[in-house]
From Swiss-Prot:
Subunit structure: NDH-1 is composed of 14 different subunits. Subunits NuoA, H, J, K, L, M, N constitute the membrane sector of the complex.
Organism placement in taxonomy: Bacteria, Pseudomonadati, Pseudomonadota, Alphaproteobacteria, Hyphomicrobiales
The protein, known as: NADH-quinone oxidoreductase subunit K
Similarity comment: family membership: Belongs to the complex I subunit 4L family.
Origin species: Bartonella quintana (strain Toulouse)
Transmembrane regions listed in the UniProt entry: 5-25, 31-51, 66-86
Length: 102
């Protein structure tokens, strides 16, 4: 069995759909929203790498590495903000984020 670009695109579309569904179905937990955003970024990276390998060009793979770097920084900063917010408020529910105003 030969794995071509359509298989990668199908897997990427499934991962993207799971990420979007995670955002829309669970709007109360900030950690799940962050994980869903990471899934969406992972599916975009899979598309970049698949097209890069298909067209035999390294630009997509380099761009995917940059996206992974930014996603790791985004996850670290987001989790650090959540830890501080949990220490101050005792909850990480999305409804309680409005307390940060002021």
């Amino acid at each position: 069995m030969h794995i071509d670009i359509t298989h990668y695109l199908i897997v990427s579309a499934l991962i993207f759909t799971i990420g979007i569904a995670g955002i829309f179905l669970n709007r109360k937990n900030v950690i799940i929203i962050l994980m869903s955003i990471e899934l969406i970024l992972l599916s975009v990276n899979l598309n970049f790498v698949a097209f890069s390998a298909f067209f035999q060009d390294l630009v997509g793979q380099i761009f995917a590495l940059f996206i992974l770097t930014v996603a790791a920084a985004e996850a670290a900063i987001g989790l650090a903000i959540l830890v501080v917010f949990f220490r101050n408020c005792g909850s990480i529910a999305v409804e309680d984020v409005n307390v940060m105003k002021g």
